[in-house]
Amino acid sequence: MGPGSFTGVRIGTAAVKGFSWAQDKPCAGVSSLQAMACGSTENGVLCCSLKARPGESFYALFQREDGFLIRLTKDKVGKDEEMEAAAERHGATVFLRDCQNAAGAAKAAWMQARSGKLQNCHEILPAYLRLSQAERLRKERMEQQ
């Protein structure tokens, strides 16, 4: 459900909602960053990130020990320096960048299902984390008036 590119997040969310609605089945809204962490087998503190724009990243930190994954931070967007500082504060030992895979997404969805946190298609919402370019430009115009 994101974060990621606006178009990719919209297409992915629409596809999941469509399949869920058509089959009248619950679905799992999975963070791209959590899916990345679930796709890794490394133990320690994981810093998972995706390129957002030049000099910025979407990122989150997770702790994995003995197969258990614990989220340390929520999904964020910020300057690469902010991500690096957060990784250092949490003692990150594993850095995963732009390495999503279907197995990680499936494992994250399976974890949601096992914990009873599936949702219906109307509850799933995209996670953009930042304004679109059109929204940013509109906001700038409104502030100038």
Task: Kindly give the residue locations of the regions a language model identified.
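DPxDG-like acidic metal-binding loop motif
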Residues: 1-2, 6-27
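Oxyanion-binding and handling regions
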Residues: 28-145
